[in-house]
């Protein structure tokens, strides 16, 4: 799910969709309007799910999409080699979430963990 917003309303720490990938805004810089042009904004962001750096430059009146990112909690059912099986604590659905090697020692069956969900993708949120 996503909503449409103007670039002028965005701030650091909010989410934006760049190249069909939800990203978190790391920096935003506004330039002054020129003699014949509108004010521009440069947005630097990092992908939530792929950690790639992306940036866009556009007029501040441009409408862009902001994803709706949900932070949920789930219970670990089983830990595999490259993924973990979670059960959502609200609607009791079971999902497979990919994990990295450094996350494995922190996960064990029965433990409650937070995860992010947006645009059909899921990521563990271990801090």
Swiss-Prot record:
Pfam family, one: IF5A-like_N
CDD domains named among the record's database cross-references: S1_aIF5A
Keyword vocabulary terms for this entry: Cytoplasm, Hypusine, Initiation factor, Protein biosynthesis
InterPro entries linked: IF5A-like, IF5A-like_N, NA-bd_OB-fold, Rib_uL2_dom2, Trans_elong_IF5A_hypusine_site, Transl_elong_IF5A_arc, Transl_elong_IF5A_C, Translation_prot_SH3-like_sf
Record GO terms (molecular function): ribosome binding; RNA binding; translation elongation factor activity; translation initiation factor activity
Localisation per UniProt entry: Cytoplasm
Hypusine PTM positions: 35
Cellular compartments per GO CC: cytoplasm
Gene Ontology BP, a term: positive regulation of translational elongation
SS bonds (residue pairs): none
Family, similarity comment: Belongs to the eIF-5A family.
Function recorded in the entry: Functions by promoting the formation of the first peptide bond.
Protein name: Translation initiation factor 5A
